Amino acid sequence: MITKKIRVYGIVQGVGFRPTVSRHAAAAGITGSVCNKGPYVEIFAQGEEKCVKNFLERLEKQPPKRAAILKINTEDVKEEEYGKFNDFQIIESEKTKGEIFVSPDIAICEECKKEMYDPKDRRYLHPFINCTCCGPRLTILDALPYDRERTSMKEFPMCPDCASEYEDPATRRYDAQPVCCNDCGPEVYLTGREERGRAAIIATRKMIHDGGIVAIKGIGGFHLCCDATNEEAVQRLRTLKNRPAKPFAVMARDVEAVKQECLVNEVQEEILDGHQKPILLLEKRKKSADSTGLCKSVAPGNPKVGIMLPYAPVQMLLFRYDDGIQMPDYLVMTSGNASGAPICRDDKEAVEELSQLCDLILSHDRKIRIRADDSVMDFYKGEPYMIRRSRGYAPLPTMVTMPWKGQVLAAGGELKNTFCIGVDGRFYLSPYVGDLEDLRTVKALQETIHRFETLLEVEPEVAACDLHPKYNSTVVAEELGLPVVKIQHHYAHILSCMAENDRKEQVIGVAFDGTGYGTDGTIWGGELLLADYHGFERMGSIEPFLQIGGDISAKEGWRIAVSLIYQQTQDKEQTMEIVKKLNLCSEPECKVILAMADRKMNAVTSTSAGRLFDAVSAILGIRTKSTFEGEASMALEFAAEAYEKELWEIDEPADGESDPDEEKKEPEDRLIMKIGSLIKYLTEKKTEGIQAEKLAYIFHQKLADLITDGCRKIRKKTKCNCVALSGGVFQNRLLLRMVEEGLEKEHFTVLRHHLIPANDGGIALGQAAYAMQYIQEGK
């Protein structure tokens, strides 16, 4: 007879871990106990040595489906120390300080789906069905350990039947904290109307069927929903949301419905129908003009559509119910928020912000503690490539194997904000918060930071934030009453890539994005950095240009196009002639831009790769303006991909090799990626009538060549052979592939993002990593 004390670390709360341990104990023939300590699960296993060994093997090989075991510590203990166990017991949770891991929300499982549609089951058509394998977790959590009294489900006492299941180790709902049924659980209702329960769901389905727009409260917030096959309904939603072109997310009935509209491989199907159920960016199928299905206005001008499957029971009931209403296979399911505001999470917010955007609001009385937007995932070389990390993924920690000790908070960026809490080598990136230009989103950030500090039981020693002095994220960090460390935007991008890849040594960082405040007070965005956790050196950048017009230049790429042409020609008349041929703008508009350039009026020096893409999109006549962030740049990428797909013959330009200024350095001896000759080539070929798609492809290839060449020169100088690629421009998969392949041909080790976004949604991780190193050095 032996006794072992076992501690299991990882995602072990809210995933049915203790019931699984109890079943394994029974199968192995051992006695003992299991207790949720908060940071870990503690198990005492007593029995014959072979039985205890069998139990441990089961634990390692057959953990709960949704668990993530990071480590298992075992030690032998003496029987007299803890006594003899007569049976195996699940002990009530205890609160212990230490490593904490919080489970994200989990999509409805197959077993619950079957029960929900079984007329004989007592949870038939129950909008809140769940079990130990699925249901809300993070979004209902007040504190740890994860028990019902510390969630928003504490307001719903279990009925005798649910309590019986909850207490029975033989059931799937043993110790399932959100367990409930139609008799004791939350209830759906229409705000401002009498319909509740079944009547509310039927009224919602009928409204969607008839072409209306509804707001629906889900797990992490509200969605705005309409029939995605109804052109009139989708266009009306676009008008109400003032969203003329930005793609809407779609929810499909099932996998087969997705395959009718999109190309889906095995990896994508597994993720699409997995327990996290993010929005996947999938390639549209080519369809005939008269085919039915998704209407064109869902994702206009985009070869992909963002699509997901229902992950909450109430969403499944929208597609299938027993009321005889024939519902479409596809619903628009876009975040329920007013422009610029965070996703709504309660009735007050929904009524105030969504009433003017929809015809009905379907809500429920289970409170959402933490907002969680849908995660968005692209694919690159057959692997997931995260665009927005939120529901289903946050707050799973990123582990960095550095000998760090301490607690830090990073406030993140101004756009696509997430924040990050670092505890030693574990970094908890929050769900998506949003753009902080709106004070409502700033308030949401402050509230969520406070709740996370409570959940993770941390008291940060320092707060990290962006270098920009006027960012709201900077203000949030400064108001925390902690020592503040400020990190340059693009340096934080590179550190986030290093942290995700657990890279400890120095890298050449290629940070390409739209904007970031530089250490010299100018706008950066096309940077080559030499970086590690101690600091960075700016080794190179895109050739600086004037960004004319302030913030509006980010929406009107033609302005930067005129500026770039003028910078290349150094002649007003010649510039105006080229602008006229390209039909970039009117003559008066051109004259204004040139005058502003001469006087440096409302003009800032910039090295922004994002704005360069916008300008080239305008020069090639693809997009001169953007109605949403990245629209012109995305259109340029799609044009280049279309060219590559057709395998047209490439006529290589005689680019910068003939530029006499190609090898010139700036005063601080910074490597400059010269773009003047490339702009000249593109304008000349476009006026000659060369296809825009072909020129878009050439632009991508030549920019990739400039990056590769720059990294090669930096390696020669520094002997650093590892390159990290980060920043929102690297969401452009064509550029990413061209750069990665170019670097690999030069025998570089290349790091890129995977499940941490390359965009500003990931920089909080880099900020937190720097702050942690800052603590170690006692700065």
What name fits each language-model region?
Residues M1-P178, N182, Y189:
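Intrinsically disordered, low-complexity, mixed-charge
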Residues Q62, E165, D323, M327-M402, ...:
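Internal gly/pro-rich beta-alpha loop/helix module
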Residues D76, C159, G221-K286:
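A phosphate-binding glycine/aspartate-rich beta-alpha loop in the early core of alpha/beta enzymes
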Residues P178, G185-E187, G413-R451, S563-C720, ...:
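A contiguous, well-structured pocket-lining segment that forms one wall/lid of small-molecule binding clefts
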Residues A215, E457-P469, T718-V729:
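Short glycine-rich phosphate-binding loop at a beta-alpha junction
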Residues D466, G481-H493, N721-A724, R733, ...:
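Conserved phosphate-binding/catalytic loops in two-lobed NTP-binding clefts
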Residues Y491-F512, G516-G518, G557-Y566, Q701, ...:
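Glycine-rich phosphate-binding/hydrolytic loop that grips phosphoryl groups
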